[in-house]
Amino acid sequence: MSKIGKFKEQDITVIPHNKEKYMSFSIGNLRFIDSLQFLNSSLATLTKNLADEGQKHFNYLSKTFPDPDVFSLLLRKGVFPYDYVDTEQKLEKPCLPSKEDFFNKLGDTHISDEDYQFAQTVWDKLKVKTLGEYSDVYLKMDVALLADVFEKFRDISLHDYDLDPCHYFTTPGFSWSAMLKKTGIVLDLITDIDMMLFVEKGIRGGVSSIFHRYAKANNPYLFDTYEPTEPTSYLSYLDANNLYGWSMSQCLPYGHFNWLTEEEKIKLDITKLKADGSDGYIFEVDLEYPSSLHSSHSDFPLAPERKHIQVEHLSPYSKELLQNLTGKQCLTKIEKLVPNLYDKEKYIVHYRNLQLYVELGLKIKKIHRVLKFKQCPWLKKYIDFNTEKRKNAKNEFEKCLYKLMNNSIFGRTLLNTRKHKDVKLCHTEEKLNKETAKPSYASCKIFNENLVAVEKKRVNVLMKQPIYVGFCILDLSKFLMYDFHYNHMKSLYGDKIRVCFSDTDSFLYHVETEDVYEDMHQYQDMYDTSDYPPEHFLHDIENKKSNR
């Protein structure tokens, strides 16, 4: 960035994360995009994944190093003593630095014997005379390998989606266009500010909580620790396959938003609303959490809320710890997503979740507002396409790509344009004076005498993302987790099971039963057991990677 200020005759524009970090920048008609915004893995990982499919995809590397033996040698990420080279004179060193000189301060890691031997082999094979020449080889390798990886990504994208990612800045932006093209859906944008704020208020992330701090299994399959005189119990970690993929395959809103009238709210029978109906609803309600449920629901309470935890919410022991360990008598003001047993006021919730909460014992005290919309499983076609592609992928490179294409859709639906930055790069005194004189001026970052980044306050915000889709995806993911816990696990084991912790799409259970594997076998249609050893009686590929 320190050099681009010298292009005085060209306009310089950026798409910023902040004053110093940019997603992309342009000099005149030349645009620079960041490959990391598309392929968010190390070059070492990307190269290895692509190499697993063979050498045929490394066209740029073979052109850069045409000797077949050298080409075969360089089919991996190179290594370089970054911290050692702190002066130009060291580039004149006539031999490879010692293994200790390859220590990476940034990663606080030493180079492996295998990597050092690779560096020595490259030095010898290419008849390198100085560390400077080795640096040239290293850089040519990096550029050629990244070019080959990105070209493979482009080939797949053009073949599967008929779109070129080079016309985009990030994978989420590219995947969003691919989804719109593949599904043909037209999404209405909310133009009513009250509806927008209503949906925003209901957005809550995944539940990540520790509910039970210590549990010890008495597992008969673990002979060293099993106590025959004690009740048999297991620690069972279960993970939902592609949780958000499942949510994105459900009926989702696409338009025709309107508030229900008082009369329509009275006539609406929540219990009779269909999961796959053409009409969907988002409710704002007051909920009562009956005290009779508190004991059985204490390890995974329904209807989690974003809350500021107050000192009065803490137990006497926790208050004492707060004082002794921090010297403070107050807590952070950062909101947390908290599962709790309190009654809820003006709780915004998807209708399917509300149906489940009522079925499990919560009571609706009052309905404040109801937002109605049209819905259908419009995203399912795209999700299924990528899921099937991932299932049939020939290598890790393609598996990661198709997974990313699905996951990035969810993130795109929750893109918060309020957080976007407005940054101008000024490379002339005239432009700098103009930008800093504006009332919207906020701050600046001086790179050098030729370049200054000026950050401005946002004058307006365009709310152009269908965040109502993201809200529904998040709530439906909670529906699946609560439904599985209460209507399967809790129904099966009763008070013999406890949630130790939950993290968005997973549970760690402490369950008291004679044989948890036999229990799973009875409900094998609910589980993906394809990763069990082939000789295990639970091994079955029927539900491999399935999210049904």
Which residues does each predicted region cover?
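Conserved acidic
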Residues: 1-548
